[in-house]
Regions:
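Peripheral interaction segments used for macromolecular assembly
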Residues: 1-125
Length: 125
């Protein structure tokens, strides 16, 4: 009997299985979910997760771009984990769901990385 490769444990996951995945705090409290991923066209690496909150903290109409390195997969919750408090989320750079973030503006991207204290995926700071 052939085994289904989707049920075998491994570290790779299809992008369509990441989109919609829950984002939780380390204690398991629900924050939101991953709306979509942003992938660097040249390197093929995931650069950002775009988070949706569905009305959480009054930021439901906005999406938050989060550097991918801020998330960790938590096998216990089968969700991505984000160690962030409510105030940090409220102040986080965001954009309206009906408009896209200006991905061509490196200064805005650099500001985003500074906010989260993470080096940009393209190098420098």
């Amino acid at each position: 009997m052939a085994s289904d490769v989707m049920t075998k444990p491994h570290q790779l996951v299809a992008s369509d299985r990441v989109e919609g995945t829950a984002v939780r705090r380390p204690n398991g409290d629900m924050i939101g979910h991953i709306e979509r991923l942003m992938i660097d066209k040249v390197t093929g690496r995931v650069s950002y997760a775009i988070l949706s909150f569905g009305g959480f903290l009054g930021i439901g109409g906005n999406l938050i771009p989060l550097p991918w390195g801020r998330l960790r997969y938590n096998t216990k919750f089968e969700a991505y984990e984000l160690d962030v408090d409510d105030e940090e989320l409220k102040r986080a750079p965001s954009f309206r769901a009906d408009k896209d973030f200006d991905w061509g503006d490196r200064a805005k991207e650099a500001e985003l990385h500074r906010y989260y204290g993470m080096p940009p995926y393209w190098g420098g700071f």
